[in-house]
Amino acid sequence: MNKLRSSAITQGVQRSPNRSMLRAVGFSDEDFTKPIIGVANGFSTITPCNMGLNKLALKAEESIREAGGMPQMFGTITVSDGISMGTEGMKYSLVSREVIADSIETACNAQSMDGVLAIGGCDKNMPGAMIAIARMNIPSIFIYGGTIKPGKLNGEDLTVVSAFEAVGQLTSGKINEKRLIEVEKNCIPGAGSCGGMFTANTMSAVIEVLGLSLPYSSTMAAEDYEKEVSAEKSAEILVDAIRKDIRPLTLMTKESFENAITVIMAIGGSTNAVLHILAIANTAGIDINIDDFERIRQKVPVICDLKPSGKYVTVDLHKAGGIPQVMKILLNTGLIHGNCRNIEGKTVVESLKDIPVKPPENQDVIRDIDNPLYKKGHLAILKGNLASEGCVAKISGIKNPVLKGPARIFESEEDCLKSILNNDIKAGNVVVIRNEGPVGGPGMREMLAPTSAIVGQGLGEKVALITDGRFSGGTYGLVVGHIAPEAAVGGNIALIKEGDLITVDATNQLIEVELSDEELEMRRINWEKPSKKYKKGVLSKYSRIVSTSSLGAVTDLEE
C-alpha cells in the first residue's frame, strides 16, 4: 500500500493536536496507521428515495472497520425532484448536483481522507457523487440506495409518474377525483428511488457500467436484504482498492463512458443521462461530447421494455438479470468494450464470463439483440437553427417521431401547465417552454408536470414539447429538451413567436423553425436579454457560473 494521504493529519509530533481531535471521535493508537475513509451519507427523510440510506451507511461503516479502515461519516444534501416538481423549488434540483459534488470534495480533501464511499438515492445524488469522485481521484465506490417496488392498484403496477398523468386524465374527464386519490395513495409504497427506468435508476446503471459500484447493485430494491449485503461488500472492496491504489480515473476512460452510453440506450434510460455523463466526463478529463450519443444511438437497439414508455419497472429488470445480463448481450454482439476495468480490478469480460449470452427464457423484460423494442436508441441528438449546439429528443414509445406545427410559446413552465389544464393545447401544436435553461431558469427545471398532463389528455402522440429546460426520467412522448444555446443567452429559441412553424424530426435529427437567417437576425436586433431573476443566494451564484447544457451544465469549466 502506498503512503496514506491521511498521514498528513495523523503522523509526526507536529500532528499531536490533530490526533487529539481524532481520539475524541473514536480513534486509538493503532487506528492512526489505517486508511481513513469518508462515508458520504445522503440519508434524508425529505424523500422516499433517501429514507433508507442510513441503515446502508451504518452497515458500510461497520464493514470498513472490519476490513481494517477507519470510517468517518458526514452528510450530503438531497432535493426531492418528485416533491419540488412543477414549483419554484425545482430550480434547485440541478443546482443540488453541484452542491453535493462540492460538499463531498470539500469534506474529503479538507480531512485528507484516503478514500470515499458515497451513498445516494435521488436523481442528483449519483452524478453529484461521481463529479466529486472524478475531481478528487481517490479510491472510491458508490452505493445506490435502491429502487422502489411498484405500487399496486387493481392489479396494475404504478409509479410516481402514474400520479402526474392522473392529473391530466382528471382535467380531460378520463378519470374522476376518487380515482386520482386512489392512484396518489398507492403509487409509492415505501422506500426507494422512483421505480421505472427514470433518472435515478439510469444513473445508478451508469455508475455500475463505469465500474464504480458493484455488479447488480444498481437494480436492487431498496427494501430487500441483498441491498444491505451489497453495502457491506462494497465497503470491503473499497478498503482493498485503497491497498491496491485503484483510482477512479483509471476506470473512467473514453471506452468506459462509451459503454455507459451504450447501456443507457439499450435499457431506455433518461434524457438526463446525457447531461450528467457530459458533466462527469468533463470533470474526468475525458473527451465525450453530445455527438457521441447520436453516434452510439445509431448502432444500439433498445432491448429492455421498461417504464416510462414500456411495461416493466426496475425490480423486474433485476429479476431478469440486471445490468450484467444487458452488458453480456451487448458484449457478445461487439457493442461494448470488454477491456474496461471495475473497482475490483476485473475487466468487463472477466466480470461477465459466467453470464449467458442470451436473456433468460419465460421473461420479456430483456429481449435478445435480434428482437429489440426499437432498432435504434431512443435518445436522439437533434440540431438545426433552433439548437446549433444540439438538444436531446426522447422518442421511445411514440409511433412517429416527426411533427411540424405552429409554435405555442410560454415563458415558464407554470404558464404552460395552466394552458394545458385549460385544454388550450391542440393536436399538431409545438409547445415551446423557454427561459428555463441553466442560466435562464436558473437551474434547468424538469417539465414532468406539462408532459404528463399532455399524455394524460391523450395528446402524447399529437403534440411536441420543446424546451431549454430538462425532462424528468419519467417523461415520454415527443419531447425535446436541453436546447442550446438557451433563450437567456440569446439562442434562437428566444426569437420565435406564436404561430411560427417548427419542425421536430427525430428521424433526420433536425429541429428547425421556418425562418430565414435574415429574419432571425432582424428579430435579434429587437431582442433584450432578460434581467436576472435572483440577485442573491445560490441561484444567483449558479446562473453566473454555469455552462451551457451541451457541455453538461457544469460550474467549473476551464476558461
Swiss-Prot record:
Gene3D superfamilies: IlvD/EDD C-terminal domain-like (3.50.30.80). The modification N6-carboxylysine is found at residue 124. The active site is at residue 472. Mg(2+) binds at residues 81, 123-124, 446. Its EC number is 4.2.1.9. One of its GO terms (biological process) is L-valine biosynthetic process. Its cofactor is [2Fe-2S] cluster; Mg(2+). Binds 1 [2Fe-2S] cluster per subunit. This cluster acts as a Lewis acid cofactor. Keywords: 2Fe-2S, Amino-acid biosynthesis, Branched-chain amino acid biosynthesis, Iron, Iron-sulfur, Lyase, Magnesium, Metal-binding. Transmembrane segments: none annotated. [2Fe-2S] cluster binds at residues 49, 122, 194. GO terms for molecular function: 2 iron, 2 sulfur cluster binding; dihydroxy-acid dehydratase activity; magnesium ion binding. Homodimer. Functions in the biosynthesis of branched-chain amino acids. Catalyzes the dehydration of (2R,3R)-2,3-dihydroxy-3-methylpentanoate (2,3-dihydroxy-3-methylvalerate) into 2-oxo-3-methylpentanoate (2-oxo-3-methylvalerate) and of (2R)-2,3-dihydroxy-3-methylbutanoate (2,3-dihydroxyisovalerate) into 2-oxo-3-methylbutanoate (2-oxoisovalerate), the penultimate precursor to L-isoleucine and L-valine, respectively. This is Dihydroxy-acid dehydratase. It comes from Prochlorococcus marinus subsp. pastoris (strain CCMP1986 / NIES-2087 / MED4).
